Amino acid sequence: MSIIKSVYARQILDSRGNPTIEVDVCTEQGFVGRAAVPSGASTGLHEAMELRDKDSAVYLGKGVQKAIKHVKEIIAPVLIGRSVFNQQAIDTLLIELDGTLNKARLGANAILGTSIAVAKAAAMSLNIPLYQYIGGLNAYILPTPMINIFNGGAHADNNVDIQEFMVMPIKANSFAEALRMGVEVFHQLGRILKEKGLSTNVGDEGGYASNLPSNEAAMEFILQAIEKAGYQPGEDISIALDAASTEFYQAEKEVYHFKKSTGIKLTSTELVDFWKNWVQKYPIISIEDGMAEDDWEGWHQLTQAIGSKVQLVGDDLFVTNTKRLAKGIEQNIANAVLIKMNQVGTLSETLDTVNLAKKHGYQNIISHRSGETEDSTIADLAVALNAGQIKTGSVSRTDRTAKYNQLLRIEETLGEHARFAGHPFKK
């Protein structure tokens, strides 16, 4: 039995230079579990609420001292003396302590930091990796990475509407090989942009963030980069997109406004046609948030139109929430769910969503947030849950490569038992 001796929280900085919370859970035996909580830029309306201080004189209102105080004064006293191995019971207690539907009282950041730190302390107590503690002996599948190589939307100050353009090395034989392929394409894209006199500055998630003639130009440059790296688009490497359509949806007018590029406005039906054309034209394997979070009719049309051809991922749509996912399953909307722990707020609730998705044949993609830290928990989680896919940004920022490097270590540790997921979407 490993008993919690103390729970401590501190304020650190995330990859955007904004404060976030880091929690330490220490046991009587001297083991320490430490977890840092990320933050999103394009957040879903239905996400659990992260608590910010809103004091404009300090960190422009983005401090997290209130959340830290809640950990120290409310959460810590009720966890001290409990076993770190009672994850479900501890997470349930945290939810009850908060007492709101969206964790607005204590803050999802305070709760999640504690939840993950408990799991890490438990793994440390047993002297086993986190992925093995969560997933057991069946945790051996390395995920296919969605490697972000171009940023737009809310993640970049450019004129591209679509938030993320990613490459998926589906023909790789190992995670290490997949990562190498993605790195080679990333650098080839940088060379292409430079040759054309375009900026090679990067966005929030490490992908290039140049101003381009159009959204289509990003696709064309990426195809060129794949070929220049020596690979066949659609055979060796496919393309995944995160449209983040909620960001350019005008709900009051029920139109999608491509305001950063051409300025065109599309109805839901017209946007479905837009995606149909792109799927026919380009080797796209996955589209995340192709419609806005509450455009259920648009999502239904999109799923009917191309759901048998590509992976349709709900991020803002489902927000890692079992109730939202259950509604999507009932209405046959999308076929995959993005898993972000801070959208729901505890490890146990995250696992509930993953299990519900698996039960109904939906794919799971374990994901980072745009405001990240050096914490690599999601790498372990992807392997623990045999999710098969991970989305953790580009290969040019340490907050992103920390996750990729952890997956390299895990693959090495698993040795001959490791399996690479490969092609993520098979109908």
Curated annotation (Swiss-Prot):
An annotated Gene Ontology molecular function: phosphopyruvate hydratase activity
GO cellular component terms listed in the entry, alphabetical order: cell surface; extracellular region; phosphopyruvate hydratase complex
Keyword annotations: Cytoplasm, Glycolysis, Lyase, Magnesium, Metal-binding, Secreted
Record: residues binding (2R)-2-phosphoglycerate: Q163, K340, R369, S370, K391
The EC number(s) this enzyme carries: 4.2.1.11
Pfam family, one: Enolase_N
Active site: E205 (proton donor), K340 (proton acceptor)
Requisite cofactors: Mg(2+)
Gene Ontology biological process: glycolytic process
The keyword Cytoplasm is annotated on this UniProt entry: yes
Record text on cofactor binding: Binds a second Mg(2+) ion via substrate during catalysis.
Catalysed reactions listed for this entry: (2R)-2-phosphoglycerate = phosphoenolpyruvate + H2O
Binding site for Mg(2+): D242, E288, D315
Location within or outside the cell: Cytoplasm; Secreted; Cell surface
UniProt superkingdom: Bacteria
SUPFAM superfamilies for this protein: Enolase C-terminal domain-like, Enolase N-terminal domain-like
Pathway entry: Carbohydrate degradation; glycolysis; pyruvate from D-glyceraldehyde 3-phosphate: step 4/5
Disulfide-bonded cysteines: none
Role of this protein: Catalyzes the reversible conversion of 2-phosphoglycerate (2-PG) into phosphoenolpyruvate (PEP). It is essential for the degradation of carbohydrates via glycolysis.
Family, as annotated: Belongs to the enolase family.
NCBIfam families: eno
Protein name as catalogued: Enolase
GN (gene name): eno
